[in-house]
């Protein structure tokens, strides 16, 4: 039995990526990773530093590397984490904007596998980051990236951003409303929160 277990373990480990493969893939996915980091940080320099930090975290990490088929999404998550960590102060400063706002759209509480979130993710990966930065604040951008690319739940966002439920729900509403406007082409600019969010 132990021999079978040992063989299964070796097969599983063989499917995991090596450090060399990860470093090569960091270079291969650099443009995408930098784009994600830029949407979160709003600054090219900070975005590049976030990608570098993600690479350092991977290099110094002790946890098992992902399986090869999970590598791309894993690198995105590590980079998103690094970018959010470097932007927590700017994100927290946006909290007051959502203090008295309330989301009444049940469709905004979608899980990470929903087709609309996948469409939103594709939009964020292809639209000019400067448009996103110019039309959404750091908090809404962070929630948008976490919910779409990171496939985070609302609770995950609360824990990661260290903000209240009401704040995250309102920021999520802002991001989802912006996406709806972009998807349907109703407006060149996202509406202000007061147009789509109801006051308590």
Predicted regions and their residues:
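Σ70-family region 2.3-2.4 aromatic/basic alpha-helix that recognizes the −10 promoter
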Residues: 30, 48-107, 172, 176
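DNA-recognition helix of helix-turn-helix
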Residues: 155-197
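Linker/hinge segments immediately adjacent to helix-turn-helix/homeobox DNA-binding domains
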Residues: 84-129, 185-198
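Short amphipathic alpha-helical boundary/capping segments
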Residues: 10-12, 117-121, 127-137, 164
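A short, charge-rich alpha-helical start-of-domain segment used by transcription regulators
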Residues: 3-4, 9-35, 45-48, 59, ...
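Short amphipathic alpha helix immediately N-terminal
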Residues: 134-156
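Generic detection of well-ordered alpha-helical segments
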Residues: 27-31, 35, 56, 134, ...
């Amino acid at each position: 039995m132990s021999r079978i277990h040992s063989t299964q373990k070796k097969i599983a480990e063989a499917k995991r990526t090596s450090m060399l493969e990860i470093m090569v893939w960091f270079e291969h996915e650099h443009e995408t990773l930098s784009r994600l980091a830029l949407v979160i940080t709003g600054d090219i320099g900070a975005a590049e530093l976030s990608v570098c930090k993600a690479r350092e975290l991977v290099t110094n990490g002790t946890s098992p590397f992902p399986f090869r088929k999970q590598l791309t999404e894993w690198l995105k998550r590590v980079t998103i984490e690094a970018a959010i960590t470097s932007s927590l102060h700017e994100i927290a400063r946006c909290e007051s904007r959502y203090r008295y706002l309330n989301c009444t759209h049940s469709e905004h509480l979608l899980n990470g596998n929903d087709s609309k979130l996948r469409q939103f993710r594709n939009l964020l990966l292809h639209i000019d980051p400067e448009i996103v930065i110019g039309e959404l604040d750091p908090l809404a951008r962070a929630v948008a990236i976490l919910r779409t690319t990171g496939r985070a739940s609302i609770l995950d966002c609360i824990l990661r951003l260290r903000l209240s439920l009401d704040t995250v729900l309102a920021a999520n509403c802002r991001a989802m409303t912006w996406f709806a406007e972009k998807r349907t082409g109703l407006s060149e600019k996202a509406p202000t929160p007061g147009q789509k969010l109801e006051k308590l």
